[in-house]
Design a protein with these regions (language model features):
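C-terminal hydrophobic helical "lid"/dimerization subdomain
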Residues: 1, 281-332
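NAD(P)H dinucleotide-binding glycine-rich loop of Rossmann-like/cofactor-binding domains
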Residues: 90-160
Length: 332
């Protein structure tokens, strides 16, 4: 098979499309023919550049944490999947490892993954769409409902309305019966939140975020603040917008990561701040069901051949606003 591998940290040019041995399924694994895998700012671009050493990745390495495709081989102990099944791989692995981090990922024509990390994908959901959902859906679900304990009738502020974690969060929260306030750094990006079903949208480049939230909520504030950016100018305003006993959840910090926090607000308001970038495969199931029923849409910038991965890494480094990029090894 061919795979995109890097043998040293560095610029996008360290990525090489090379022949590697075909993977063989272990007893609890499956081998997947990859049809889609995404390019992530941290889990791909930063790791390849060597600017995310805390993940512990050492070259040589094949990136790609969220492939989707078709099962072509199953291990002897695998009973939940069969050859021909359409699947997506979620990052969490049995024993606490992370697919694409502690093992080779899916930037390849074939990949091996634990069967327990795979989720079946219904025919109504395309592979590119499935890859975005497998990467961001379980994390969004975990943040909103497992950590954030969001309930129908509560109000949630979601930053990054046009991003994938934000856009999926908006749709999941709205489907659960919450009042959703979407916020972004431009009018166009905030409008995406409204288009996805948010009750209110705020362009925080034009207004003070806290003032806008207090106007919308008649001074009450929000029950839950969902932020995966950590913008040091905006995140504190979100925290200040929480009502007493409010909760903040996060799984990202590419806009920071250091944010000034008024701890007097935290303890006087008895706030809870929680972070967790991980999730479980079962958290993907309601997301895939919603997508198959037409109730969850994802934002995809482009789908290109896997061979173009170096150019896509360079594009993502040069343009912080570029959307989700999907690599498809069946295109070349």
């Amino acid at each position: 098979m061919k795979a995109m591998i890097f043998n040293e940290f560095g610029p996008p040019g360290v990525l090489h499309y090379e022949e590697l041995p075909d993977p063989v399924a272990g007893p609890d694994d499956v081998v997947i023919e990859v049809h889609a895998v995404s390019v992530n700012r941290v889990l791909d671009v930063a790791i390849r550049a060597g600017t995310a050493p805390h993940y512990g990745v050492a070259p040589p390495h094949v990136l790609g944490v969220d492939p989707s495709g078709v099962v072509v081989e199953t291990g002897g102990n695998v009973s939940n999947l069969s050859v021909g099944d359409r699947v997506s791989v979620t990052m969490g692995m049995p024993g606490g490892g992370r697919y694409g981090i502690e093992c080779f990922g899916g930037d390849s024509q074939l990949t091996r993954a634990p069967a327990a990390s795979c989720v079946k994908v219904r025919d109504e959901v395309g592979f590119a769409e499935a890859t975005v959902i497998s990467r961001h859906g379980p994390v969004a679900y975990n943040l909103l409902f497992n950590l954030g304990e969001l309930k129908a009738g509560q109000t949630v502020l979601i930053l990054g309305a046009a991003g994938n974690l934000g856009s999926i969060g908006i749709q999941l929260a709205k489907a659960a019966g919450a009042t959703v306030i979407a916020a972004a750094g431009s009018a166009a990006r905030a409008a995406i939140g409204t288009a996805l079903g948010a009750d209110h949208a705020v362009d925080y480049s034009a207004v003070n975020l806290k003032d806008a939230i207090m106007d919308i909520t008649d001074g009450d504030g929000v029950d839950l603040f969902y932020d995966n950016i950590a913008n040091p100018d905006i995140c504190p305003l979100g925290i200040e917008s929480l009502k007493r006993f409010g909760r903040m959840v996060t799984a990202g910090a590419h806009g920071g990561p250091v944010v000034p926090v008024n701890f007097a607000t935290v303890y006087h308001q008895q706030l809870t701040i929680m972070g967790n970038p991980r999730s479980k495969a079962q958290d993907a199931l309601p997301c895939f069901d919603a997508a198959a029923e037409g109730n969850l849409k994802v934002v995809i910038d482009r789908v290109v051949p896997l061979a173009e991965a170096p150019a896509m890494h360079a594009l993502m480094e040069a343009d912080p606003a570029v959307g989700k990029i999907i690599l498809d090894s069946t295109l070349g």
